[in-house]
Amino acid sequence: MGFLSKIVDGNKKEIKRLGKLADKVLALEEDTAILTDEEIREKTKSFQKELAEIEDVKKQNDYLDKILPEAYALVREGSKRVFNMIPYKVQVMGGIAIHKGDIAEMRTGEGKTLTATMPTYLNALAGRGVHVITVNEYLSSSQSEEMAELYNYLGLTVGLNLNSKSTEEKREAYAQDITYSTNNELGFDYLRDNMVNYAEERVMRPLHFAIIDEVDSILIDEARTPLIISGEAEKSTSLYTQANVFAKMLKAEDDYNYDEKTKAVHLTEQGADKAERMFKVDNLYDVQNVEVISHINTALRAHVTLQRDVDYMVVDGEVLIVDQFTGRTMPGRRFSEGLHQAIEAKEGVAIQNESKTMASITFQNYFRMYNKLAGMTGTAKTEEEEFRNIYNMTVTQIPTNKPVQRKDNSDLIYISQKGKFDAVVEDVVEKHKKGQPVLLGTVAVETSEYISNLLKKRGVRHDVLNAKNHEREAEIVSNAGQKGAVTIATNMAGRGTDIKLGDGVEELGGLAVIGTERHESRRIDDQLRGRSGRQGDRGDSRFYLSLQDELMVRFGSERLQKMMNRLGMDDSTPIESKMVSRAVESAQKRVEGNNFDARKRILEYDEVLRKQREIIYNERNEIIDSEESSQVVNAMLRSTLQRAINHFINEEDDNPDYTPFINYVNDVFLQEGDLQDTEIKGKDSEDIFEIVWSKIEKAYAQQQETLGDQMSEFERMILLRSIDTHWTDHIDTMDQLRQGIHLRSYAQQNPLRDYQNEGHELFDIMMQNIEEDTCKYILKSVVQFEDDVEREKSKSFGEAKHVTAEDGKEKAKPQPIVKGDQVGRNDPCPCGSGKKYKNCHGKA
């Protein structure tokens, strides 16, 4: 209780502080009102000039804090002249919280878009770029078009970044003072910028300040979804088909156990025996059968934990994911780790090839790279701990401009879903008769269609808004507040929509919101309630629940069931009890806690790859930006030679065999016969290094002479190709390691620590392989340059999607044609060890 009161007190103190600063802004209203349009723009130029002379980011921020009242007053005056609207004091307070790098929680209809204009203008003055981020391209386009009028009036430029834009158009959009974009497109542009071969192909500037609209949706709900650019992997789909047939044969409890609370499913001993017989293996859990067990587990997840028309839909022979937080389908996105293919096998549609990850990043790690991050939403307080721990952001609840008049009624709980839905329909019919508009919220497509059929039977005209007819969303939502309107919507109605009341509706009680089930997240329930009672309008809300709802089943409705039976309650009699509502909220908190733990765990694992990604991208960028790559190559040649000497030469051996070392040197650095054992026999390691190094220098000089002024371009191309090839393989290897690492806990090992240690070892091996490949190709390649080749710029950046098979196939840049010796993975290792290449120096 003490912790909660501290949060409440903290919010009160912060509101008081914001209020005082907002008063300073409002006090300048008369002074700014007398300025001419040109004088306002001159103020902008003056601020920009002052900031341009300050190089240090911290000192720039101090200056922005100093000019905040004057800058915000200018935006208020500009808004008054351009839109005939002036931000209220509470909006100014929200704008100050955003400038601080925090989250402004503002209720629906309180004008978040106008609130964001003040911190956007202020921070754009620094000239480092401000990204205003929305959840979809429709909102980015409409907001940038509308707000550009204000920013242009104030003397700032605005860019719009869309998936369909070309490289040039994207670069231009990012070069503006303010750039509107979706979170997806920003993440993909970052990844693509780190896959280019030439500096001029990059589109982004360094990440400075981002303001995220619907911040909880992007940083919490989508935190576990990685952005992935991938290419097609050559893998057979037959195992998916076999695993699907096997999963269909299994019986619950006998062959597998399913935990409804955690949604975990795994084979029993009997199920494992069946699998061994079906797949003809001796020990299912043997390391060599990891692919089989992986496919079986994935097929089980597809059959047991995922439901059609709830978690995904099948449209025109294609499996589309349904976003659990918006109810929308997500074309282009695919479940990763083979789950999408398992669902395709389950549904009998064409199984698409798996994809190989070429680059990936989670939103958690992408957004933490900004110098300053802020956001706004109607619902964030319930997740404040996560925002504080992971993003170092505080949630400030901004007061409403007018008091909230919506009445939130307590939940009604029924024994069965049939009893619940019958009661819902009766409530809708009654409200519809008097003309009160009703918004019915459901958690799944199938529920919305079921209620729709019940209402049709009662002759109630209504609209249905779900993933199957989302194209009419704007039209349906615009009519939802009209007299007599009945709208059934999945969670998708909760985002980016503002339902305005029609004539005479206020007198009828405003918009009535009816929830047909509690979502596992309290925020989603709050969003549904928030559709009603905007800007001081009247309204009411109520949730109808049943003991058969998923949340109730997962978190123990047995006690309630027994109590209702003991009281002799039938299906038509509900319980209306604060105790029950508290129990539901407690269940939601547990789910939220589980989800937070899962996101935290993902971040801990992803931190390993984040550090490695940073090293690789920094190295790539240094190579691209460097005029001279010979120093990098020289360092690689020296370290590779030194490693070989450390590995092959044992000075304590009285009768050493130099053959493996000579074979390795001739294979990686020199031509056959260039190094003889007589030259190094009896020499110590330092002498051997100098002897071989002089030969390497000679070989390098010959290559330089052959290539002339093309040498630097050739080296750069080889370096980038080596890095990209091995980095892509490394991501794949790390992904495989991560998929099976949790099994280590059964052996009393710490999976995270093992992942960190083994990931570090794999990274070291990859770096060595990059160096070795670079040495070999630079010294031993026969090079021919194509005549009159112009650099071909990528025409569009619109190919990357979430985990799709076509991603990452960017047009190749003109590069030297390399004719080098290739060693097959199963060939004998050239070092002479007698091992296969993949188990020796080809190890990745």
Swiss-Prot record:
Zn(2+) binds at residues 829, 831, 840-841. SMART domains: SecA_DEAD, SecA_PP_bind. Residues 793-813 have a biased composition (Basic and acidic residues). Gene3D superfamilies: Helical scaffold and wing domains of SecA, P-loop containing nucleotide triphosphate hydrolases, SecA, preprotein cross-linking domain. Pfam families: P-loop_SecA, SEC-C, SecA_DEAD, SecA_PP_bind, SecA_SW. Keywords: ATP-binding, Cell membrane, Cytoplasm, Membrane, Metal-binding, Nucleotide-binding, Protein transport, Translocase, Translocation, Transport, Zinc. Its EC number is 7.4.2.8. The gene is secA1. Its main location: membrane. Residues 793-825 are annotated as: Disordered. It is a peripheral membrane protein. It is found in: Cell membrane; Cytoplasm. ATP binds at residues 91, 109-113, 498. GO terms for cellular component: cell envelope Sec protein transport complex; cytosol; plasma membrane. It is an enzyme of class 7 (translocase). Its cofactor is Zn(2+). May bind 1 zinc ion per subunit. Part of the Sec protein translocase complex. Interacts with the SecYEG preprotein conducting channel. Has a central role in coupling the hydrolysis of ATP to the transfer of proteins into and across the cell membrane, serving as an ATP-driven molecular motor driving the stepwise translocation of polypeptide chains across the membrane. This is Protein translocase subunit SecA 1.
